[in-house]
From Swiss-Prot:
Gene3D superfamilies: Farnesyl Diphosphate Synthase
Protein name, UniProt field: Squalene synthase
Sequence similarity: Belongs to the phytoene/squalene synthase family.
Organism: Ganoderma lucidum (Ling zhi medicinal fungus)
Pfam family, one: SQS_PSY
GN (gene name): SQS
Length: 467
């Protein structure tokens, strides 16, 4: 941010200005891949690897910063892994390539990626990562330098992903269907494009010895991590994707008749463009709420996965995108502006999340706080209200089970201490105390009745006439 932007931020959002200053002053990168001491693991001294790092910056500047802080040679491995998947995704997304051209490339990409000298310059000029494929020789050269254990994982994940992408691309081209039908199809698509990324990364952690070997077998948890990120991006990027006629929201959700009936209509939406048409705002928000509920279903599995990580750099690499996803979900929820503009969390909020996402407890509480914000904005007339409440409650329950919070206390005049009445749990504690007091009172009464009975019996015995 320039000086003018910072001055404007100081005047309009002073708290955010303070957060950014704190981030600038105190958050130091864990490593600098350009330093000579890092060259053996980062490969910065080689022109080919340096170009790969440049491509990473161009494709995802925010993500590249997180990758570069991963310790050892894992940063270089993840960089190449990301570029391979980005190259694959670029071909799959290119609407200018006919299906007969796209299919053989997609289905052979895992072999082409490591083939010396292979490049591809037939992507449309508007594809932002086109140059990556044009200069693919730098990627293939570095891939072939990797240890076999890492390279085999990259090739295996690419082969699985390309199969799913090719199948979906062929279906769209041959059936003229532009929509994903069911939630199951939606989950499968997200598994191919994101869940497999989580699987590959986790296998890297295990293969490197930096995490437990059995972690690589936790496929359900790794899939949840990927699906949570992908589904959040799909919600946020709705309008951008719609303008390019890419529709990832499943018809099973956006076409539900319940959402139409909730606003007095007979049916749900029939076409996705109806979501951003004037007069459909309320029904569109109900659809969006259903999409958010679907994402929140992956939250506790993601928290379970993060609890298994032991290396700080790996934990931060995995945790920061997840907390960003929760922040993005909260920003999108009940925000109709999302259907017309590309929205994103503010820079200061992102900086705060980066600084706070350092351990499982704090990350869990970040999840909980954003879940509370969404639940506070939920409306009872929303057909998904109950399911949303349950999803948010499960996050609360997970946090209390693994990282119990403390009931807040408040000092009153005279030096006394009482439970803070603004803490919702105060009522639970007060009810428990009242129950304990009532049980104690009943016990005392029972003891008094017993003593009284004994005295009465003793008195009657003493007054009885002797025989």
């Amino acid at each position: 941010m320039g000086a003018t932007s910072m001055l404007t931020l100081l005047l309009t959002h002073p708290f955010e200005f303070r957060v950014l200053i704190q981030y600038k002053l105190w958050h130091e990168p864990k490593r600098d891949i350009t330093q000579v001491s890092e060259h053996p693991t980062s490969g910065w001294d080689r022109p080919t690897m340096r170009r790969c790092w440049e491509f990473l910056d161009q494709t995802s500047r925010s993500f590249s910063g997180v990758i570069k802080e991963v310790e050892g040679d894992l940063a270089r491995v993840i960089c190449l892994f990301y570029l391979v998947l980005r190259g694959l995704d670029t071909i799959e997304d290119d609407m200018t390539l006919p299906d007969e051209k796209k299919q053989p490339i997609l289905r052979q990409f895992h072999k082409l990626a490591v083939k010396p000298g292979w490049t591809f310059d037939e992507c449309g000029p508007k594809e932002k990562d086109r140059q990556l494929l044009v200069e693919w020789t730098v990627v293939s050269e570095e891939l072939n330098r990797l240890d076999a254990c890492y390279r085999d994982i990259i090739i295996d994940i690419a082969e699985k992903m390309q199969t799913g992408m090719a199948d979906y691309a062929h279906k769209a081209a041959t059936t003229n269907s532009i929509y994903i039908g069911t939630v199951d199809e939606y989950n499968l698509y997200c598994h191919y494009v994101a869940g497999l990324v989580g699987e590959g990364l986790t296998r890297f952690w295990a293969a490197s010895g930096k995490e437990a070997e059995w972690l690589g077998d936790q496929l359900e948890l790794t899939n949840a991590m990927g699906l949570m990120l992908q589904k959040t991006n799909i919600i946020r990027d709705f309008r951008e994707d719609a303008e390019e006629r890419r529709f990832f929201w499943p018809r099973e959700i956006w076409g539900r008749d319940a959402y139409g009936k909730a606003v007095g209509r007979a049916n749900g939406f029939r076409e996705m463009h109806e979501l951003y048409e004037r007069g459909n705002e309320k029904q569109a928000l109900w659809v969006q709420s259903g999409m958010v509920v679907d994402v929140l279903g992956h939250a506790t599995d993601s928290l379970d996965y993060l609890r298994l990580l032991t290396k700080q750099s790996i934990f931060c690499f995995c945790a920061i995108p997840q907390t960003m996803a929760m922040a993005t979900l909260s920003l999108c929820f009940m925000n109709y502006d999302m259907f017309h503009n590309h929205i994103k969390i503010r820079r200061a909020e992102a900086a705060s999340l980066i600084m706070r996402s350092t351990n499982p407890r704090d990350v869990a509480y970040i999840f909980r706080d954003y879940a509370r914000k969404m639940h506070a904005r939920a409306l009872p007339e929303d057909p998904s209200f109950l399911r949303l409440s349950v999803a948010c409650g499960k996050i609360e329950q997970w946090c209390e089970r693994h990282y119990p919070s403390f009931v807040r206390l408040q000092q009153v005049s005279g030096g006394g201490i009482v439970f803070d009445p603004s803490d919702a749990r105060t009522k639970v504690v007060e009810a428990a105390q009242a129950r304990d007091n009532e049980l104690a009172r009943e016990k005392r009464l029972a003891e008094l009745r017993d003593k009284t009975g004994k005295l009465e019996r003793k008195l009657r015995w003493s007054q009885a006439p002797s025989s």
